[in-house]
Amino acid sequence: MAKQRVINIRGTSGSGKSTLIRRLVELYPEKEPVHVPDRKQPLFYKLRGDGLLPLSLLGHYETACGGCDTIPSMDRIYELVRERLAEGDSVLYEGLLISAEVNRAVALHTDGFDLTVVRLNTPLELCVDSVNQRRWAKNPDKPGVNPKNTEAKFKQTLATCKKLDAAGIPVVEADRDGAFHAIKQLLEA
């Protein structure tokens, strides 16, 4: 049996988390959306491909922003991580809200799961620009975002990754392309 991995991508708004996920999904020829009652969009996707770990990708990606930000609570996200691991899959998950979480990630690590955190080190100015581009694609008349919110999340993500590293969890810091290659290597069976 292939080794199971848990891979958590972290970054502020506009850092490229969802875009990175979409790029990683393309590695897998088999993509099965898993729906649950009372939820329009998939709760997660089962991804399969030769030479790659069987993978559950949490959340949905039917909109510009996706991932765990589409799951109602932090408790449900981490229940789902553990459920998918119990089923034999590796797990890939990301989201803005999850980027600030520490305790549940440390609990996964303490319980012996092979967790790797990948922090996107996209420059703050590029993150703000990406958020504005996404915003203006929906409504060109909207004003730009207040960069203070993005900056606060940027700092918070950096601080939480330092805590995870101090807890013994491997934290890989990379730009968008470097993160793709690091995660691709982790997913190779």
Curated annotation (Swiss-Prot):
Entry keywords, A to Z: Host-virus interaction, Inhibition of host innate immune response by virus, Restriction-modification system evasion by virus, Viral immunoevasion
Keyword Zinc among record annotations: no
Gene3D superfamilies to which the protein is assigned, alphabetical: P-loop containing nucleotide triphosphate hydrolases
GO biological process, one term: symbiont-mediated evasion of host restriction-modification system
Reaction(s) this enzyme catalyzes, per UniProt: 5-hydroxymethyl-dUMP in DNA + ATP = 5-phosphomethyl-dUMP in DNA + ADP + H(+)
Record SUPFAM superfamilies: P-loop containing nucleoside triphosphate hydrolases
Function of the molecule: Phosphorylates 5-hydroxymethyluracil (5hmdU) into 5-phosphomethyl-2'-deoxyuridine (5- PmdU) on DNA as a step in the pathway leading to thymidine hypermodifications in the viral genome. The phosphate is added internally to the DNA polymer. As a final result of the pathway of hypermodification, 5-AcNmdU substitutes for a subset of thymidines in the viral DNA. These modifications probably prevent degradation of viral genome by the host restriction-modification antiviral defense system.
Name of the featured protein: 5-hmdU DNA kinase
